[in-house]
């Protein structure tokens, strides 16, 4: 039988069984190691209302809270919502993560401080 991927589309290796999780989009049961995971950090307040709220606020130093969500997708939902895309046979072997998306107006982050 031909084999499409070295890891069979999973990160299981020596474990016999992995607990299933539910897809965020369609609620399909997917093994936790096979699910495509996406960690999203967003402002609770939408971009259009940030200025209004900061002007109306009493405290100048108040930082608006963020919303931290870990999304789990089944393979079909991840492809459909363009979280991942199918790649050529040679490109599948490339394990480097895709480049991080940075908005055009964002300032570059300072390098981490040495310890």
UniProtKB/Swiss-Prot annotation:
Primary localisation category: cytoplasm
Entry GO terms, CC: cytoplasmic side of rough endoplasmic reticulum membrane; cytosolic small ribosomal subunit; ribosome
Subcellular location: Cytoplasm, Cytosol; Cytoplasm; Rough endoplasmic reticulum
MF terms in GO: mRNA binding; structural constituent of ribosome
Gene3D superfamilies cross-referenced by the UniProt entry: Ribosomal protein S26e
Biased composition (Basic and acidic residues): 87-97
Record's keyword terms, sorted: Cytoplasm, Endoplasmic reticulum, Phosphoprotein, Ribonucleoprotein, Ribosomal protein
Region feature Disordered, mapped onto this chain: 85-115
Superkingdom of origin: Eukaryota
Modified residues (Phosphoserine): 54
One Gene Ontology biological process: cytoplasmic translation
Keyword Nucleotide-binding assigned: no
Classification via InterPro entries: Ribosomal_eS26, Ribosomal_eS26_CS, Ribosomal_eS26_sf
Role noted for this protein: Component of the small ribosomal subunit. The ribosome is a large ribonucleoprotein complex responsible for the synthesis of proteins in the cell.
Family note: Belongs to the eukaryotic ribosomal protein eS26 family.
Subunit structure: Component of the 40S small ribosomal subunit.
Protein name stated in the entry: Small ribosomal subunit protein eS26
Organism: Ovis aries
Lineage, opening ranks: Eukaryota, Metazoa, Chordata, Craniata, Vertebrata
């Amino acid at each position: 039988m031909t084999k499409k991927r070295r890891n069979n589309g999973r990160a299981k290796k020596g474990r016999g069984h992995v607990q299933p999780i539910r897809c965020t989009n369609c609620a399909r049961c997917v093994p936790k190691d096979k699910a495509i995971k996406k960690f999203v950090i967003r402002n609770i307040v939408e971009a259009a209302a940030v200025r209004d709220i900061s002007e109306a606020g009493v405290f100048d130093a108040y930082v608006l809270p963020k919303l931290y969500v870990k999304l789990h997708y089944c393979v079909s939902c991840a492809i459909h919502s363009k979280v991942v895309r199918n790649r050529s046979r040679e490109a599948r072997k490339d394990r480097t993560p895709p480049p991080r998306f940075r908005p055009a107006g964002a300032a570059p982050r300072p390098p981490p401080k040495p310890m």
